[in-house]
Structures are given as C-alpha cells and as structure tokens.
Amino acid sequence: MALKLNPFLSQTQKLPSFALPPMASTRSPKFYMASTLKSGSKEVENLKKPFMPPREVHVQVTHSMPPQKIEIFKSLDNWAEENILVHLKPVEKCWQPQDFLPDPASDGFDEQVRELRERAKEIPDDYFVVLVGDMITEEALPTYQTMLNTLDGVRDETGASPTSWAIWTRAWTAEENRHGDLLNKYLYLSGRVDMRQIEKTIQYLIGSGMDPRTENSPYLGFIYTSFQERATFISHGNTARQAKEHGDIKLAQICGTIAADEKRHETAYTKIVEKLFEIDPDGTVLAFADMMRKKISMPAHLMYDGRDDNLFDHFSAVAQRLGVYTAKDYADILEFLVGRWKVDKLTGLSAEGQKAQDYVCRLPPRIRRLEERAQGRAKEAPTMPFSWIFDRQVKL
C-alpha cells in the first residue's frame, strides 16, 4: 500500500481509527498474477485488472521469524492440544444456521419468512450497511484460513495434518463458517438488500486477499488474531444490542450467538500469546509493539463492490457513527490486551524490549487523545450511496 495505515485521521469523514485512508490512485497495475503471457502486454493488463485489490498493499515481508524459533511452536504442540483445542466445541453440540431461520421444510415457512421481513422493515438502512459489512467480512473466511496457514511452525503442512495447530485452524474455520452462512441467509430472506451486489463484494474481497503484515510469524499472527477476535466480538455484540433496540429479537439472538463464538475464539488466541510471553517475553513484546506500530488493519480492508474504491472506509465510517465498532473500541482492545498479558509487569527485558513495553503501555491513552482531537476537527459527515442497499443514501 502506498500510504501507511494511519489511525489518526482528521478528514471530513468521521472515519474510525482503524480505517485506511482513501488512496489517490486505486486499482494500481503494480499487482502481478502468474501468467504465461508477456509482462506488460495489454492482454495481461486486461486479465489482471478484475483481480487486483482496490488499493495498494504494503511491501511484503516474509519469514521474518528466526528459524530456530519454529522449534518453540513444535514443542508447544502437546500444550496446544490440552489448552487450545478445549476451546473448540464438538460439531454435535454446535448451533447451526438453521436453528435461527425459517424452516424450508415446514408448512409454516412462508409465514415465518413474512414475519422475518416485517421485522426487517423496522430496521434503518445504516444498520443494514453495517450488518452487510460484517457478513461480508465473515464470508471471506477462505482468506483467513489461508493467512493462518502462512504462519511458520503452525501451518497445516498437508491439508489434513494431525498437529494440534493444524487441527485448531481447520476446526476454527469450520466454526467460523457458520457465521457468514447465517448472516447471509438472514439478509437474503430480509428483502432489504441487493444480494447480487453483496455477492460481488464477497468475490472481490476473497480474490483480493488481505494484508495483515504478519510476515509468516506466528508471534505477529496470533497477536493479530487476538485483536481481531475481540474486535468481532465487540462488533457483533453491538449489532445484537441495536437489533434489539429496533425490535428484532430474533436478529439480536443471531448476532449475540455469533458474538459468543468470537469471545470463545478470542480466549484461545489470547491464551497462545500469553504462553509466548511466558516462554519468550522479549520476543513477544517486540512482536506486540511491531504489530501496533504497523496499526492493526481490519481483515476486510481490501473490500470492493466494483464501484467504490473506498468502500471499506465508508462502511467503517457508518460503523463508527452507529457505535458498532469505533476508534474507542480500538484503544480499549489494546488496553485490554496489555492488561490480559500483564505487559506492564514484564521484567528482565532487553533494552529494545523495554522500549517496546513502554510503547504499547502508553499507546491506548495516546490513541484516545489523538482521536478526540480528530473528532473535534471533523466536519459534518456527507451521505453516500451504498450498492448493498440499492444505492440508497446513508450518512457516513
């Protein structure tokens, strides 16, 4: 990405601190697909264009973790079996999307759908923009499994590896898969959204991938997932609360159930990082500071619908305005993780480790101060058409 991800914005749009700044030049031809055609040819450019991310990604750094540290994760396989796999649920005890939706085999199916659609009529457009954005994020699950399988020392080497790390990744993916399925079916039945535009956005997003800047390092990767799972827990929890306020108890139950899953997954990922702090406090605090200096980018930051190159920024601005996921949440999550991992109490660190410790411990209040200043300078937010809701205008 040509511009650094910057959480401290003072634009006219009230963008949250985790949003990416708009790009002056988008859909750049700097992205190359493997091809037998000659590079630079018009044919190559035409083939590549539909598959390019809507914005540039960072210079890619790979395999930054020293090879000897891979042994740490191999040695933790039994620990992961006993301490991480316990946060998975047996399939037979898991909820399924059908538990919350009209039964298509029931004689009352048509009536159940009518009731769902009547409830959905009472929900405002801006809420649906956020719910659709959350659903699209969940539906890009193939990207997230791919990301986990880039991590050295914990990846699924065969596709059916029996290691605890590989089992976790596959089973976590299987549990998460229900989230997008459930929200997708609800939105389809609601009649409030343009499903074809949503489906295009999902395809674009999966094709674009993501740019978490985790460098194949499980230190960076598990810090990232710890942050993300808590962020999705907060986001789905807030959509549940607001659905209830809008009178749709069933939708509130859907969002709340998904939030509970995210909380359980957050517990697993934060436990992994807690163990890394125990084994390698210096390396782990350096990784924590590294991820926070880069700024945590949301998994769907390359979102695109075929029209709006800054779609993620616009979706994020609506989420910020509604209080679904905000700059304050970003700072609160960081503060929570600092406390959860007892970063302020680490001792015996190197000089660089102490600097990293000081940086992450001081960062939450700094983020809050800068965000307050940005909000104070922000002008009246514009409105924007969203293709997901048939180009109806929504205030950012």
From Swiss-Prot:
<feature type="binding site">
    <location>
        <position position="229"/>
    </location>
    <ligand>
        <name>Fe cation 2</name>
    </ligand>
</feature>
<comment type="pathway">
    <text>Lipid metabolism; fatty acid metabolism.</text>
</comment>
<dbReference type="InterPro" id="IPR012348">
    <property type="entry name" value="RNR-like"/>
</dbReference>
<feature type="transit peptide" description="Chloroplast">
    <location>
        <begin position="1"/>
        <end position="33"/>
    </location>
</feature>
<dbReference type="InterPro" id="IPR009078">
    <property type="entry name" value="Ferritin-like_SF"/>
</dbReference>
<dbReference type="Pfam" id="PF03405">
    <property type="entry name" value="FA_desaturase_2"/>
</dbReference>
<keyword id="KW-0560">Oxidoreductase</keyword>
<comment type="similarity">
    <text>Belongs to the fatty acid desaturase type 2 family.</text>
</comment>
<keyword id="KW-0408">Iron</keyword>
<dbReference type="InterPro" id="IPR005803">
    <property type="entry name" value="FADS-2_CS"/>
</dbReference>
<dbReference type="GO" id="GO:0006633">
    <property type="term" value="P:fatty acid biosynthetic process"/>
</dbReference>
<feature type="binding site">
    <location>
        <position position="179"/>
    </location>
    <ligand>
        <name>Fe cation 1</name>
    </ligand>
</feature>
<feature type="binding site">
    <location>
        <position position="265"/>
    </location>
    <ligand>
        <name>Fe cation 2</name>
    </ligand>
</feature>
<feature type="binding site">
    <location>
        <position position="138"/>
    </location>
    <ligand>
        <name>Fe cation 1</name>
    </ligand>
</feature>
<keyword id="KW-0934">Plastid</keyword>
<dbReference type="GO" id="GO:0046872">
    <property type="term" value="F:metal ion binding"/>
</dbReference>
<keyword id="KW-0444">Lipid biosynthesis</keyword>
<keyword id="KW-0276">Fatty acid metabolism</keyword>
<keyword id="KW-0443">Lipid metabolism</keyword>
<feature type="binding site">
    <location>
        <position position="262"/>
    </location>
    <ligand>
        <name>Fe cation 2</name>
    </ligand>
</feature>
<feature type="binding site">
    <location>
        <position position="176"/>
    </location>
    <ligand>
        <name>Fe cation 1</name>
    </ligand>
</feature>
<keyword id="KW-0275">Fatty acid biosynthesis</keyword>
<dbReference type="InterPro" id="IPR005067">
    <property type="entry name" value="Fatty_acid_desaturase-2"/>
</dbReference>
<comment type="function">
    <text>Converts stearoyl-ACP to oleoyl-ACP by introduction of a cis double bond between carbons 9 and 10 of the acyl chain.</text>
</comment>
<feature type="binding site">
    <location>
        <position position="262"/>
    </location>
    <ligand>
        <name>Fe cation 1</name>
    </ligand>
</feature>
<protein>
    <recommendedName>
        <fullName>Stearoyl-[acyl-carrier-protein] 9-desaturase, chloroplastic</fullName>
        <ecNumber>1.14.19.2</ecNumber>
    </recommendedName>
</protein>
<keyword id="KW-0809">Transit peptide</keyword>
<keyword id="KW-0479">Metal-binding</keyword>
<comment type="subunit">
    <text>Homodimer.</text>
</comment>
<dbReference type="GO" id="GO:0009507">
    <property type="term" value="C:chloroplast"/>
</dbReference>
<feature type="binding site">
    <location>
        <position position="176"/>
    </location>
    <ligand>
        <name>Fe cation 2</name>
    </ligand>
</feature>
<keyword id="KW-0150">Chloroplast</keyword>
<dbReference type="GO" id="GO:0045300">
    <property type="term" value="F:stearoyl-[ACP] desaturase activity"/>
</dbReference>
